[in-house]
């Protein structure tokens, strides 16, 4: 149990990695998602918007940002959610605002990225 708590503490201390891409097409996508994390467009739609193939964009996300498009979008949404959760906003409201179909889908993403549910993450922070 102590090892698990240490892992959770370490993950809370790590900054979210949202590097800026050099490629202008990726830059347009990343900026749009930072401005509106709930934007539902997938890689195919973004490819049409920026004049590239979805395969090219997928390769660029991996080579320039080190993560897939989906993972990067989850990180953006997590970064948008954390201050709101810390302020005590309801998980259901945040989930809807960030484009998740259900609060449980948001909680599942949160758990994958942080190792904890939203409510437990902040409860552990407060008790540490």
Annotate each language-model stretch with its function.
Residues 57, 61, 105-106, 110:
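Short hydrophobic/aromatic patch on the recognition helix
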Residues 114:
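Regulatory input/activation interfaces that engage signals or partners
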Residues 40, 44, 63-103, 123-128:
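Terminal helix-turn-helix DNA-binding modules in bacterial transcription factors
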